[in-house]
Amino acid sequence: MKVLMSIKPKFVERIFAGTKTFELRKKLFKKTIDTIVIYSSFPEKKVVGEIIIDRIISSAPKPLWESLKNNLGISEKEYFEYYKNSKVAYAIKIKKVIKYKKELELKDFGIEKAPQSYQYINWRE
């Protein structure tokens, strides 16, 4: 199963460049997911590619930072600000990234509004 996930453009760039090999989240999917369809949020507002998931790591924020900080594509300040009220941090390990040749619109998925975090989808390119 796939999810459409909103990711800030600066992090999308780092994912495609290979400098960000984990996607961070505060909450995790309730269903088993193998692929994340990347929605590059404002100002791009385009569906730009896919992430094939390797595995998901969960931990308290501090030890997760200590073990993965060089692969997160985020500053220490940004990281701890993001997780400031969280007891658990989730790191989605990226196995493979697929960049679409042609960017897509949300309407191509039958979606009118971008998800705040993620949305389950049934779709194949």
Model-identified regions with their sequence ranges:
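Short conserved beta-strand and strand-loop elements enriched in small hydrophobics
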Residues: 34-41
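Contiguous surface segments at macromolecular interaction interfaces
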Residues: 1-2, 6-32, 45-48, 56-125
